[in-house]
Amino acid sequence: MERILDWNKYLDTAAKMVSEGIVMLKNDNNALPLDIDKEVAVFGRIQFHYYKSGTGSGGMVNVTKVVNILDGLIDNGVKVNEKLLDTYRKWDKENPFDLGEGWGGEPWSQKEMPLDEGLVKETAKSCETAIVIIGRTAGEEQDNRLEAGSYLLSDDEIAMLTVVRENYKKVVLLLNVGNIIDMTDINRIAPDSVLYVWQGGMTGGKGTADVLTGKVSPSGKLPDTIAYKASDYPSDANFGREKNRDIYAEDIYVGYRYFETFAKEKVLYPFGFGLSYTEFEIKTEKAEITEGAVKLSVSVKNIGSYKGKEVIEVYCEAPQGRLGKAARVLCGFEKTRELVPQEEQVVEIAVDIAKLASYDDSGVTGNKSCYVLEAGEYKFYVGSDVRSAEYACSFEQGEDLVTERLTQSLAPVESFERIKPVCEVGAFSIGREAVPVSEVDESARRLEKLPKEIAYTGDKGIKLWDVKNGKNTMDEFIAQLSDYDLSCIIRGEGMGSPRVTAGTASAFGGVSENLNGFGIPAGCCSDGPSGMRLDCGTKAFSLPNGTMIASSFNKELTSELFTFMGLEMAANKVDCLLGPGMNIHRHPLNGRNFEYFSEDPFLTGKMAAAELKGMAGAGVTGTIKHFCANNRETNRHFIDSVVSERALREIYLKGFEIAVKEGGASSVMTTYGRVNGLWTAGNFDLNTVILREEWGFKGFTMTDWWANINVRGKEPDKTDFAAMARAQNDVYMVCPDGEKNDDNTLVALENGGIERCELQRNAANICGFLLHTNALKRAEGIGDTVKVINREDEEQEDDKPVQFYKVDRDITLDLSDVDTKKGTSYSFALDLSNFGIYRVIVTASSTQSELAQIPMTLFSMGTAVGTFTFNGTGGKAVSMEKETPMFSRFTTFRIYFAQNGLDLHSIRFELTDKER
């Protein structure tokens, strides 16, 4: 069957997500929407360099074009002051954008053009309104910092905003950021309008301009609380203070749960807040309390003069009981359709009462390790943010009710003190209590839960598709696999494995010839979450970031967008997108907050479920990550997140639980670090007890790439696959070669370190996942095809496969036939026998003048090795060299040519004796 991916609809849907995710914090002096008949002045170099996403694996999507905000304004008919624009263009050319030093080394911001006050005054004579754009980035292995140019405004930005404010009648500030930033100087300078336009992917400028010009009224809501200072956040005292450990002393009181309970005065903008060009009247028309649910009918009327959408948010105030609760907790939300002035819509929201229960990790209610609906009054509030939501209804719970009876799992092994509310004359103060520690023997628990071994039969000719078609059982299929086969199937191969789509993150499943012989296909994973990362240079669609998607509060639009994403994946033979990222915004300095949704687990889970449902419509899926408590990038491979079991279950695991139970998640990635002393890659409680036994997860799990694994009390080891597999974490990502690897699986099988039945269970999980993939359909010869229409010719990719070259210690590639025309790329891949630091020598010539600057940039696995800038050589061959680490067997390279006039001769790779 052929399916259609309409690229124009894809672009339009992404731009719509941008416009619905933008959050307008203020709009004084009727600064917005813009009058397109009047000229505007645009300040800030980010007008040319829109941040489509943050950095690292979540942002490395190759695109043909990013629509920046300036493009969007001009395309929407806005008149932009040409003199100011030309001045910026000239300065930007003389002061190139700083790409930084590659992976984890990109600057958080760029230097700004110093403003001549005379120019500002001159442009202000013809322009009533100025737009100032400030940009930020951060990402993988790069947290934000509490310093100028990162979380704080830089001196240049303060000076720019100040002089513009002094000279313009109306000032609009756009924050092109992946994460909230400090608002102190912004509040002091007081622009008329302030909008978080986030990072909107390749269509970000279009969606932003649609809002600025009034084509779309802003309807985004804050997925995080904006406090006055970074130190106001409850996690601040325990974020990054220790090299290898963060203690989650704030417990369940994360974000608005803390502020609304203990510190309302520290909030600048509350969770869920966001303005529109119009106004809405919200009334709870009906509240029905049943045994299992609270059903609310809420009328929303547009009483303003612009069309627009509104988000209805429902919060619950539970009785404090013996456990202690947050003052308000989000328990439902819906977004209206677009309402014209005076139009009204009734929104129906149902709240599952059982999901209002709190987890008792201490036994204080008499129900240890249970979710308990404590006795007392449960009040519900309805509105458009957590602070302004008004009382709607309540019900009385007569006695404690256990809604779910579980067992202690993943509890800390060391006690610490956590926050607990103390009620004093109608207000709460912060008390403390000791956190319960684990009483579980993890090794004994694992042995108690060993599956039954399947007797080995050898090859009976059963193929995996025979299981799919009901001809044989999965047990009969798994019985054929030898010990060696079982050791291979738990290896992911990559990055850039030739078994799957070029430039992707990994192959899994059929990673050996023997496994292929059983009809096990090689499934394909690609980073993720903001679109496909294809390191061979293939162009893909860059999506709005997770924070922007959460800000839309629009589940239906999210599913629609990710159906397009799924079709694009299918067209590129990708089975798993490594996303959505689901970690909680515990602190605003976390560098990967842009990938994640929110400080709230309910919103996180609902939006992730919407993404998964969308991808499922195309026969593909996402890998929910990072499981769990991955809330800091600094020293992420060794960090220990020390968290109470209650906080884990109610905050840091809850979003994952919703994604599994409501979104049908079938692929999960663990973290690099530890939770309560044990690396998550080998944590049995996490991967088996909670994920599979409690939540009913049916699918496969994987480690993060080159993750550490350990046994309680022992040092981490990247080769301890036995510890990973017996935890029921199924695949180690990644190995250079699926058929041979320096791991301990077979040795552990011989000495009793792992049981054969456990490896069979891993194999069944992996094969069970592959049963439902396009990869298996292709192996059967019945795969669907996806036809892409309305994609411009220059965006189409060459179908020629990437060529692999085997390398022992050195190789020289003749590149004299490569097209070096400006804007083109050339990709190739190396199959390495030896890993280490390689010297890269590029030889080229040019007949241009000696002053000519002809740059070409070399990328390794999507990360810049460096730019080789040649001058005119009089036609003589000249060599330039750099060094790059290569520690993956399959390494994909891409050369990008930024200027005409270079005659490329060769590229040589030589292994050096340098250590990493």
Locations of regions flagged by a protein language model:
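Glycoside hydrolase catalytic-domain context in secreted enzymes
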Residues: 1-388, 408-850, 854-916
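Short beta-strand elements
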Residues: 388-407
